[in-house]
Amino acid sequence: MLHCDKTYLINLPHRTDRLRIAKQQFDRAGIAMPTIFPAIDAKRLKLRGTVEDNQGLIGCFLSHYFILQEALLNGYKRIAVFEDDVLLSANFSARLTEAMAQVPDKWQMLYMGYYERSGKAKVQVSENITIPKNTWGTHAYMVQNDGIKIMYDNLQTIRSHIDVQISEDIVPKMYTYCISPAICFQSGIKSDIK
């Protein structure tokens, strides 16, 4: 259904509560449990000049960055990335199959979950696919082919939250689409990003 070389679930090892809920989500959707990617805990890194409030932001950013790096090193053609606070829609599998049949062949990034910020209208491509114009969120996405390298190359410096940086710096450079309406959401579980 995801047809990925690798599917990742980012999880801080001490957040077993989030891992348990994520596992329930994938079981309910009939999807094999993704490979757990141990999230970077920036609180354990010795970062000079880093304000404590930024540690969660840095850890999240680096977790996504190192997944992209691993994908490049292993020659993966398509990966899916989920954060451990993801909630899959009740009809996730059917909606994903439907959307994958509609997404243009040249896609490089596909948001399965996201938040639309106001200000810019999205462009409707098909019944279930839009082009993002002002989108945040990294809780559920796929990236493929040279999109993996484009993302990796454009995330060499941490300037902001990763989803903001992707939206502002990377989305305009790639064939990026959203499944619309979204099929993944974020739970209200307490976040480790302040």
Regions found by a protein language model. Give the residues of each.
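An acidic/histidine-cluster motif and surrounding catalytic segment
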Residues: 1-82, 86-194
